[in-house]
Amino acid sequence: MGAKPALIVVDVVNGFTDPDCALGTACPEVVSANKALLDEFRRQNLPIFFTSVVYHNKEQASVFRQKLPALECLKPDSHWVKVDPLLERRESEPLIEKQWASSFFATDLADQLAGCGADSLVVTGLTTSGCVRATAVDGLQHNYPVLIPREACGDRDLAVHEASLYDLDAKYADVISLSDLLVRLCSLGYGESTKQ
């Protein structure tokens, strides 16, 4: 991890955290882990980005949506595309709308990361085998060291979750515990954030 990590909270939105949605599953432990990370990033005034999958028209990611028809519910005014309220997203924390798995693909995330001076990434969220994995791989391909706290990401299938973390740790990122990451973050020694 560098001196100024950025946190990318991938798709921790109602559609993925609420089992009433076809895309969702109950994952309170993942939400809680993300809240702990957000608290520390906010305390140190480090950069935070949220992402959400949103489709504005039928042409966007049409092949992806044919492969996974449940994505059709992710429309701009839908409850399902809103960040889980337990994370208490602030207006100052950018929300990146995306249409594909990677948070980098066809978005301005790379420009925003460069603009804020981030030198490494902490990638969390849902789902481990999909958008978290794609974002972590693309983060590396943008030449950022990537850390993934295992408790802060999740998947509908535990075996797929574990296999994805194993593969990511082998090739693309450092998968570590939430507690270890929080210790590393505390050691950076940035001051308290201002109230936003």
Positions of the model-derived regions?
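Active-site acidic carboxylates
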Residues: 1-90, 94, 185-196
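A short glycine-rich beta-strand->turn/loop micro-motif centered on a GG-aromatic cluster
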Residues: 122-125, 145-158
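Internal catalytic-core helix/loop-beta-alpha segment
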Residues: 78-80, 84-126
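Short acidic-hydrophobic, aromatic-tinged amphipathic segments that line or gate anion-handling sites
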Residues: 96, 174-181
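Glycine-centered short loops/turns at secondary-structure junctions
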Residues: 45-46, 117, 143
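Active-site-proximal loop->helix
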Residues: 155-169
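Short Gly/Thr/Asp-enriched flexible loops that form oxyanion-binding sites at enzyme active sites
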Residues: 132-142
